[in-house]
UniProtKB/Swiss-Prot annotation:
This is ATP synthase gamma chain, chloroplastic. F-type ATPases have 2 components, CF(1) - the catalytic core - and CF(0) - the membrane proton channel. CF(1) has five subunits: alpha(3), beta(3), gamma(1), delta(1), epsilon(1). CF(0) has four main subunits: a, b, b' and c. Produces ATP from ADP in the presence of a proton gradient across the membrane. The gamma chain is believed to be important in regulating ATPase activity and the flow of protons through the CF(0) complex. It comes from the Eukaryota. Disulfide bonds join 240-246. Residues 1-41 form a transit peptide. The keyword Plastid applies. The lineage of its organism: Eukaryota, Viridiplantae, Streptophyta, Embryophyta, Tracheophyta. Residues 17-36 are annotated as: Disordered.
Length: 364
């Protein structure tokens, strides 16, 4: 009996360490399970969802890039094809206007008045996802408005484009004369509607100067917001306010256009150079004032149409560049997420193998 009792007690004491080890092993496994299986599974699902989302976004940005590339080619051709006519028309008008400066001729669109109020046309895009295209233009508009306020000159805005319309509607402190929505393809009819409003404002003397702020198309990777004096048409520049101060913008496009060797060039340091005389082949049977009156509406329409075309080409080029960068970034993000997914999946498999090995060792 004593031996039996001592043997039973020795067996019970023999099993105590094993029982302790087996009860301690599960907590280790239990602490490992939440950190591997549930959380890692959640991470894997999240990574899979993110990879799928990035793939879908990449498809969208790639498609938008291709669409913008197809459209910008047509817009670029319209800009390039329209520039010779517009520049030649401006050159002819400059020459005629300069000849008429010495004569007592009343041409409303060339009449230089003391500037009390300026109409600022702001040409923006209709859509977003084009990088900083619209923001850069609107910042330049705000800068020009601040300059006019500093000079003490009143102003009003003619907004063209849905993005600009939304921007100025949210700022009721900025006076806006009219809002115009842009189109996917600017036409002469659309430009004529804007020109009629500008013409009535200037001829009725509601404004004394009309400036046009738009984005000039330079190349597929570069576009510059520029200010262009639309009215009055004056090759001499230096349009002044009631105090005699020049109200022309420092980077005014029109008053930096001069002729050099018979071609229009841009001279920042010169307002005007000697203009060559008309070719002897050109002969005008009518009075120059009548011709100027007939050409000025065409000039107004062509300049507005050109600004709309250049703005559209710049917007499409900016969108193509932005979507190209977005596609590249999505591709890089997809690679990074795939690497993280593979690492998490490998860690999950390794953890499961370690659990199996630990369980097998515990059963031995």
């Amino acid at each position: 009996m004593a031996c039996s009792l001592s043997f039973s007690s020795s067996v019970s004491t023999f099993h105590l360490p094993t029982t302790t080890q087996s009860t301690q092993a599960p907590p280790n496994n239990a602490t490992t399970l939440p950190t591997t299986n549930p959380i890692q599974c959640a991470n894997l699902r999240e990574l899979r969802d993110r990879i799928g989302s990035v793939k879908n976004t990449q498809k969208i940005t790639e498609a938008m890039k291709l669409v913008a590339a197809a459209k910008v080619r047509r817009a670029q051709e319209a800009v390039v094809n329209g520039r010779p006519f517009s520049e030649t028309l401006v050159e002819v008008l400059y020459n005629m206007n300069e000849q008429l400066q010495t004569e007592d001729v009343d041409v409303p669109l060339t009449k230089i008045r003391t500037v009390k109020k300026v109409a600022l046309m702001v040409v923006t895009g209709d859509r977003g996802l084009c990088g900083g295209f619209n923001n850069m233009l609107l910042k330049k508009a705000e800068s020009r408005i601040a300059e006019l306020k500093k000079l003490g000159v009143d102003y009003t805005i003619i907004s063209i484009g849905k993005k600009g319309n939304t921007y100025f509607i949210r700022r009721p402190e900025i006076p806006v004369d009219r809002y115009f929505d842009g189109t996917n393809l600017p036409t002469a009819k659309e430009a004529q509607a804007i020109a009629d409003d500008v013409f009535s404002l200037f001829v009725s003397e509601e404004v004394d100067k009309v400036e046009m702020l738009y984005t000039k198309f330079v190349s597929l990777v570069k576009s510059d917001p520029v200010i262009h004096t639309l009215l009055p048409l004056s090759p001499k520049g230096e349009i002044c306010d009631i105090n005699g101060k020049c109200v022309d913008a420092a980077e005014d496009e029109l008053f930096r256009l001069t002729t050099k060797e018979g071609k229009l060039t841009v001279e920042r340091d010169m307002i005007k150079t000697e203009t060559p005389a008309f070719s002897p082949i050109l002969e005008f049977e009518q009075d120059p004032a009548q011709i100027l009156d007939a050409l000025l509406p065409l000039y107004l329409n062509s300049q507005i149409l050109r600004a709309l075309q250049e703005s559209l080409a710049s917007e499409l080029a900016a969108r193509m560049t932005a979507m190209s960068n977005a596609t590249d970034n999505a591709n890089e993000l997809k690679k990074t997420l795939s690497i993280n997914y593979n690492r998490a999946r490998q860690a999950k498999i390794t953890g499961e193998i370690l659990e199996i090995v630990a369980g097998a060792n515990a059963c031995v």
